[in-house]
Amino acid sequence: YKRQQLAQPVTFGHHLLAWHEMLVRDEQRLNQVKVNLNVMPLGSAALSGTPFPIDRKLVAKKLGFKTISSNSMDAVSDRDFVCDFAYACSMIMVHLSRISEELIYWMNTHIKLVDIDEAFCTGSSIMPQKKNPDVPELIRGKCGSAIGSLTSLLVLLKGLPLTYNRDLQEDKGIIIESISEVLACLNLMPRLIVTLTVDKEKAFLFSKEDYSNATDLADY
């Protein structure tokens, strides 16, 4: 599909690999977040550093940090790594939401291209013929919470002067909630995907409809 219209035939495996590529980028983002936060602020004290002759590099090595912070005032007030993490969480949820939307669309009664196990669905309260894709819809909905967490952090930080301000205690609850929701969705999605079945006959019929091979014919 392109712009929700039949476009060109591809294998289902090719489509699944497109989902894989999105998640690979998410993994790369998380790895970069790990690099960015692997800086030891110890020794910055309240804001102006410590007068004691500590060996910060030795302490960093002992604690497993890759490097030390360069400026004590920045180290005390820096929450870039929290925002980076929240952004990575948001992108994971955006990708899971897009996957969910495609599943919901394909399960549409007018298309019925795929189906998932009933464990991830519910029936209707008054329409017994319906099979509602609850888990994909809930994952799609949770995406808004992750984006909201990122927005909350950015708004929290935008007006803060250097160095530490008590406002910063709010970042813990925000990022912990975001992480919790992302982990729950990442736990559910693969369990859902392994139950996915494709109606091969219908997929083959779609591949022949609406001149979807027109581009290949023109190229030929």
PLM region spans:
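Active-site pocket-lining segments that scaffold enzyme catalytic pockets across diverse folds
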Residues: 5
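Glycine-rich cofactor/substrate-binding loops
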Residues: 110, 129-220
